[in-house]
Amino acid sequence: AYLKGLGLIDLINEAVGTILLEMPEKDVGYGESYLQRCYTLHTALYTQKAYVEIDGNRCCPAESEYCGGYGKIYMFGEGAGAAFMNNYIAGSRDELIGRVAGYFTYGGEMSDEVRVSQYVPAYIVNGSSTAVYKFREANGTDAYSYSGGVAEFYNSRVPLRKVCVATDTEGDAGKWMVNAYREMFMYLQRSANVSTKYLEPTVTNPYQGYVPAPPISRFALSPRNPVINGKTVVGDLQVTFMYDGERFSHIKATGGGFMAEEGAYLDTWYEVVPQEVLNNTAPRHSVPLLLANHGGGDDHLMFLDETGILLTAGREGFAVVAPMHSGITSIAGEAFPLLVKYMLDKYPALDPERVYVTGYSMGGMATYNCIAAHPEIFAAAAPMAMPLFGVPESARALYEKYDLPTMLITSTYDFAAWDTEHGHPNDGGLAVLQTYCEFNGITPVKEFDFTKYPMIGRPFDSFKLSVINGEWRNFEWLIRNDKGVPMVGLNVTEYLQHSLWPGYGDIAYNFLRHYRRRAETGEIIYTE
């Protein structure tokens, strides 16, 4: 009743995530021993395969089991619970506070001795001046705005790092919790990106034996495009889960294994479509389509969320189709082009000249399979975090006829496509550069020279260094053909491990968006 009265039950379901609430009572035992229980809880939240059977129902304390991903965790505290958060959680070891995407307190004092251990978006109502100061300091706020009774202090270089401050004279904590979520927290998420030793496997009951969370010490703060009642908040895209057990059943995987489950076929996908496409008000052939392929073990909707593709699509107004392909990656080259054709036939506003493809890890493999089988239907490709293991001879014959702009997206701790020890793409990553240079009429190099050309190892035509979200250095190289068109690219983000990151959506689309393939001739057209 208490949770329902605050409105948190509805928020939990709306968020498709986790809300941790510290209660206002003083006699619940807040202190160091309670903090240890918080560590155990956080370990469970970030643990895979953590569930118990209760009355025949599977109950999942783990974020990944509940919503298919990580990082939608928000902390709320009132009264004594807020004081516990301020004095124990905020300054805890291992940056416990850095695992949550939003931190709300209603009341609650804070000791002068506490130092907030990492930046965290905070919403403080009836808080002390000490708490406001310390959270502003942790977030590096240097700018200010005021509206509707709420003061917002934010970091002008990284605006996601902010502190909202308000005073409530009506004693309505629930109203402010809902405000904090809807105005701030639901647009934020954490992603597990930097690999060191962080979350050690737990060996204590009741979590003994679960697959441990990845060894992570830093959770990046990133923007998010939440889905509420089947629509994205940014861009008002309709997100629809599709199941069709017949349409593609004639193409079945064979051989067994993770990517080729015997007899499996494409029957499940998500469609993410702008409203003007759904209601037929968009002009014919005016909206691009992105085929987006998830990684191994990923939920296909959370993949769109945690790579930032949902947010990029909302901002840019393109459509997305995301197939579930666990067990059928081996037949992606046959089945997924038919899924693209189905989308183009179903929605006349989608542009057949601007069909793009991307995918992460196993989804990168699906991307290679698609562009090897049917390069003619795609205007550009951006495989992520996956080496190239060769292409069939049939693909070589197709590439004699069709060019295909291709960018490999990876990171410096990506075990799949990057050689961390030597600081450049691994053999499979280099094969992407060599193969798609050759296919696009660019002479491959005889030997890579990483002394002369650090990281990329070969001549290039343009280079860009940027910083994403104020903390992640990003390197991008483009290689042009004899017409001056950039046809091959390499994009590398520093320090990220092999995991989903919300910056990838923008990186991929910023490359893909420049290309279209003429329907009549198959020619690639590039626009700045």
Where are these regions (language model features)?
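A domain-start/cap signature at the N-terminus of enzymes
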Residues: 3-6, 15-18, 26, 32-43, ...
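Flexible "cap/lid" loop of the alpha/beta hydrolase fold
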Residues: 109-121, 387-404
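Short, proline-enriched alpha-helix->beta-strand connector loops that line the catalytic pocket
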Residues: 116-122, 158-161, 400-406, 484-488
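Acidic catalytic loop of the alpha/beta-hydrolase fold
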Residues: 128-130, 413-418, 497-500
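Acidic, glycine-rich loop-and-strand cores that form catalytic or ligand-binding grooves
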Residues: 130-143, 424-469
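Conserved acidic catalytic loop of the alpha/beta-hydrolase fold
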Residues: 38-71, 335-353
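Short beta-strand/loop motif that positions the catalytic acidic residue
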Residues: 124-126, 408-410
